[in-house]
Amino acid sequence: MRVFNFSAGPAAMPEEVLRQAADEMLDWHGSGMSVMEMSHRGKEFMSIHEAALTDLRDLLGVPASHRILFLQGGGIAENAIVPMNLLGARNTADFVVTGSWSQKSFGEAKKFCTPHLAASGKTENGFTRAPTRAEWQLSDDPAYVHLCTNETIDGVETFEIPDLGDVPLVADVSSHILSRPMDVAKYGVLFGGAQKNIGMAGVTVVIVREDLLDRALSICPSAFEWKTIAANNSLYNTPPTYAIYIAGLVFQWLKRQGGLEAIEARNIEKSKLLYDTIDASSFYLNKVEPAARSRMNVPFFLADETRNEDFLAGAKARGLLQLKGHKSVGGMRASIYNAVPLEGVKALVEYMKDFEQRDA
């Protein structure tokens, strides 16, 4: 029996994708091979690779000025890879810290430069807001400005993206990429691990403006140098072939759903239902300012936290899994990525109401 999986990542996958992957496991399109067994330079995998790149470009509307790269290492590795590729002759990068992940990015950058804290969304209740552009205090000559546009742990999403002129904007989009349309031209770099909305863990997507490919530090390993990866069409070293294949199936699935406009409408409906339930209750609490609430990751707390384990046990009994909040903040967290259906959110809301009524 399939359950409703609210994991923050690795996360729920579209059932259609899982079934297609299962059907093709032993024999991909009459090749007699599993995708796992293919040479990454053979014609079979090359067709998978090129289709994935093309479909992602179509879905996001990536302009010709930007290259799409498939790398490894996840978002954590990109926290080091970004400064090694973008600092050039500069020694400062600016950071807008809106939660735990951008805080990690800020800390990692200290190994390569003197990072400048341009703005913070931290309040007495933790990270609960997204600073406006007017609050950003940029340094005089930063190599780039870093922003995590959706904080997976804290549930803070930044929707208003400013134009920074000549300063490249770098965005960690790991946990909301493909959940809504984006103006990719506004960004110098977008990066994200796949294991939330793109597919399975193992591949990292980087979208970089082509004119930024000549800034790498001499210490940057060639396997992580974007210019080298771009020149070799993401095949400089053996790529995570099966993860790219799964990502390609997800891209095709998204197209069949009507693209990102249709997906965004679904995600708005799902998140509104859950937030409305929380706000109407005196038993559940979300601390994030409404304008900055994530559509993908919804943290909430029980008024009586001694009931946390009872809540989780009851949810599991109903087939509602992976609702425990991150250890750094506690409480609960429902990650409602693209693959989580509206029926799953309705089932969660029904359970939350039943649990509150029973507790009362």
Swiss-Prot record:
One of its GO terms (molecular function) is pyridoxal phosphate binding. GO terms for biological process: L-serine biosynthetic process; pyridoxine biosynthetic process. PROSITE patterns: AA_TRANSFER_CLASS_5 (PS00595). Catalyzes the reversible conversion of 3-phosphohydroxypyruvate to phosphoserine and of 3-hydroxy-2-oxo-4-phosphonooxybutanoate to phosphohydroxythreonine. This is Phosphoserine aminotransferase. It is an enzyme of class 2 (transferase). It comes from Burkholderia cenocepacia (strain ATCC BAA-245 / DSM 16553 / LMG 16656 / NCTC 13227 / J2315 / CF5610). HAMAP family: SerC_aminotrans_5. Pathway: Amino-acid biosynthesis; L-serine biosynthesis; L-serine from 3-phospho-D-glycerate: step 2/3; Cofactor biosynthesis; pyridoxine 5'-phosphate biosynthesis; pyridoxine 5'-phosphate from D-erythrose 4-phosphate: step 3/5. It holds the Pfam family Aminotran_5. The gene is serC. It catalyses: O-phospho-L-serine + 2-oxoglutarate = 3-phosphooxypyruvate + L-glutamate; 4-(phosphooxy)-L-threonine + 2-oxoglutarate = (R)-3-hydroxy-2-oxo-4-phosphooxybutanoate + L-glutamate. InterPro entries: Aminotrans_V_dom, Aminotrans_V_PyrdxlP_BS, Pser_aminoTfrase, PyrdxlP-dep_Trfase, PyrdxlP-dep_Trfase_major, PyrdxlP-dep_Trfase_small.
